[in-house]
């Protein structure tokens, strides 16, 4: 994802003490294996920075309550995510995209094609999680019935890993093999800094690869 020059945010109330003139409108794309912790981080960004969370899993469940998790159903839900993203851009609202692994670089290109006309800054963040750790997390989720996507199995981790494109060179890489609270803090601090106009390489470095 290429980071374009950002325009001042239109219509969105800033989160926390940041003045409106200092805030860039942003779109965060969380990249990572199933079980990397994308949803936990997305919720933290929504709660702490006021980003609108657009989740493909939630949208797919609403569109197809009885779902076979086919390619067609997943792509329909992804199209709906892109539509929701564009509406948020029209409203001047920053977004975090959840429920998408972005294992294929072309999906990040789709995000760019939606937001480039609105002057939003794309922030790709790769949650780097060892497959074995992600596998164990999903197994625990299944045991406790904690995820809406019923096709989400431990073996899905290795299926996605096999087709995972290398994240874009400008992605912020965060070590996701650490406590969720630490991962969330690192990402929230980094995104808050970029949103204020700080260069990505000035973001907090604790746990960032």
Task: Kindly give the residue locations of the regions a language model identified.
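Conserved substrate/cofactor phosphate-moiety recognition/catalytic segment
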Residues: 36, 40-91
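Hydrophobic anchor at the beta1->P-loop junction of P-loop NTPases
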Residues: 30
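Glycine-rich phosphate-binding loop used to anchor ATP phosphates in small-molecule kinases
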Residues: 76-118, 122
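Small-molecule kinase domains that catalyze NTP-dependent phosphoryl transfer to phosphate-bearing small molecules
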Residues: 143-186, 194-197, 201-204, 208
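Conserved phosphate-donor/acceptor-positioning beta-strand/loop module used by diverse small-molecule
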Residues: 118-138
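P-loop (Walker A) phosphate-binding loop of NTP-binding proteins
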Residues: 33
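Extreme N-terminal, non-catalytic leader segments
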Residues: 1-25
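Conserved nucleotide-binding/hydrolysis micro-motifs of P-loop NTPases
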Residues: 58-60, 102-103, 128-133, 179-180
């Amino acid at each position: 994802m290429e980071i374009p020059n950002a325009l001042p945010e239109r219509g969105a109330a800033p989160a926390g003490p940041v003045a409106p003139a200092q805030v860039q409108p942003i779109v965060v794309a969380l990249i990572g294996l199933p079980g990397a912790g994308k949803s936990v981080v997305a919720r933290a960004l929504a709660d702490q920075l006021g980003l609108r969370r657009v989740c493909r899993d939630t949208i797919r469940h609403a569109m197809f309550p009885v779902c076979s998790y086919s390619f067609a159903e997943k792509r329909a839900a992804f199209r709906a995510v892109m539509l929701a993203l564009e509406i948020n851009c029209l409203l001047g609202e920053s977004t975090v995209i959840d429920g998408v692994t972005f294992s294929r670089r072309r999906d990040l290109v789709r995000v760019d094609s939606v937001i480039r006309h609105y002057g939003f800054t794309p922030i790709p963040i790769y949650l780097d999680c060892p497959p074995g750790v992600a596998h164990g997390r999903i197994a625990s989720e299944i045991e406790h019935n904690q995820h809406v996507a019923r096709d989400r199995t431990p073996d899905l981790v290795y299926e996605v890993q096999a087709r995972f494109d290398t994240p874009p060179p400008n992605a912020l890489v965060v070590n996701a093999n650490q406590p969720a609270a630490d991962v969330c803090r690192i990402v929230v601090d980094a995104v808050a800094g970029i949103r204020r106009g700080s260069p990505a390489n000035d973001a907090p470095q604790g746990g960032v690869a």
